[in-house]
């Protein structure tokens, strides 16, 4: 009888205010670290992490009030509860796993809504892109338009569904093109009429898998294939720094957060 594969994780994080924003409204849960002081630039790496582990990034909605507070509220709650989630996932059947993730999303949503209510703001919101690693599997859970990629053998696939609305515009110079609209769901939304459609994906881990979580401050400027090339060519922290530099060189109009996890 074969035993469990003993994977370890190496993780690297970079978060930057970008060139245009007045504050860094992105946040994250990375080990014990969240951006509690909303620093303009954060870099951190964690090596040789034993399973289970969980990581997340949050992109506060700049179009709504208190976007930075919303992402921080979600990051703090995620950081405080993710170990309990990992414990519950152990030996849970498929139905129970879905219930665990659904409970987490609604709890995060309620925390953001409560914060907004206390601040007397009608609406505040944030995205979520998260990874939960058990001994042999990864679970992707996301809300909003922050992306999760899997790079395997040089190929890159986005492995989460984006809750982003798109609009087709007809430009007389550029022709028809698709542009981003708002979000169809996010943490902080009113669920009294419409609830969440859960975006969950389960993946069997393999050695040398590379996961990348990022806010749209990266993907607005850097193509998927470029992300794959850089993470395959460069090591943990060098790759996220290079990707950040690319986004900044091409405008850096939004906050940029990149979280890379290597399966070893």
Segments from the language model and where they lie:
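PP2C/PPM-type serine/threonine phosphatase catalytic domain
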Residues: 1-264
